[in-house]
Amino acid sequence: MTARKPGWLRVNVPGGARYQQVRDTVKGLALHTVCEEAHCPNVAECWGGGTATVMLMGDVCTRGCRFCNVKTDAHPPPLDPDEPRHLAEAIAELGLDYIVVTSVDRDDLPDGGAGHFADAIRRLKDIPQLLVEVLTPDFRGDAEAVRTVGRARPDVFANNLETVRRLTPVVRDLKAGYDQTLAVLARMKREFPRIVTKSSIMVGLGETEDELLEAMGDLRAAGVEILTLGQYLRPSAWHLPVVEYVKPEKFAAWREAGLGLGFRYVASGPLVRSSYRAAELFLRGELASRPPGP
């Protein structure tokens, strides 16, 4: 039985001049955005503020996670080699100073798309004053693919744990893995310590309080610095049902628990998503204070 959606999950209707500008630019340059593909509830806030989370490598994923609304196919279309250049042109046209770049999983490619991702990062880093956050696939845990992305020097590297250990085989595609995600995050922080690491967990899927706190602790042990916690919202009747709509006060308590574990920043709330822009100002200050290095 699916829980009934409460009033605190209401969102603003998208609109406004800045929202329309971002929408028109995204459409005109044929960009794929998570905001649209995943039906993100924060599209009004982010696009209205001139921020978008864009997707690389097309809009068809080789994995079929049971919480995600992105299209899936074992054999998606080939990569567009001009996509990284087009992406950088679009971001320059939008005039942003912070961009989140994510992608579908591409298990059909030898490097999982790591080289394509790195090309996009380097082009984006050529835009003055632009900070680049990437939310990448796990590349099946391949160390060299992770290094390829790290060498491109994104400012923030994110890979999402998504849920607690017990629920991972139910919630995520079987090609993903709880320990695989932790290993990718740990490798990035170990080999590229100046890159800020980030991860996200959804709640309301049937996890217990102890399981959630354990997952948060596992992320800290992997060196993750930024954590986002948000309510799972069912995209369609074909996806996993919501077991619980968590009250805002519990999110507030988890934020304090996360800070107590040592996370540098925790965004925790019903409508928070992994690419949520609430951490943007914190990250800008954090990155500016870090000394140069690998």
From Swiss-Prot:
It is found in: Cytoplasm. Pathway: Protein modification; protein lipoylation via endogenous pathway; protein N(6)-(lipoyl)lysine from octanoyl-[acyl-carrier-protein]: step 2/2. Its EC number is 2.8.1.8. It is an enzyme of class 2 (transferase). Keywords: 4Fe-4S, Cytoplasm, Iron, Iron-sulfur, Metal-binding, S-adenosyl-L-methionine, Transferase. Residues 46-264 form the Radical SAM core domain. Its cofactor is [4Fe-4S] cluster. Belongs to the radical SAM superfamily. Lipoyl synthase family. One of its GO terms (molecular function) is 4 iron, 4 sulfur cluster binding. One of its GO terms (cellular component) is cytoplasm. It catalyses: [[Fe-S] cluster scaffold protein carrying a second [4Fe-4S](2+) cluster] + N(6)-octanoyl-L-lysyl-[protein] + 2 oxidized [2Fe-2S]-[ferredoxin] + 2 S-adenosyl-L-methionine + 4 H(+) = [[Fe-S] cluster scaffold protein] + N(6)-[(R)-dihydrolipoyl]-L-lysyl-[protein] + 4 Fe(3+) + 2 hydrogen sulfide + 2 5'-deoxyadenosine + 2 L-methionine + 2 reduced [2Fe-2S]-[ferredoxin]. It comes from Anaeromyxobacter sp. (strain Fw109-5). Binds 2 [4Fe-4S] clusters per subunit. One cluster is coordinated with 3 cysteines and an exchangeable S-adenosyl-L-methionine. [4Fe-4S] cluster 1 binds at C35, C40, C46, S275. [4Fe-4S] cluster 2 binds at C61, C65, C68. NCBIfam families: lipA, PRK05481.1, PRK12928.1. PROSITE patterns: RADICAL_SAM. This is Lipoyl synthase. The gene is lipA.
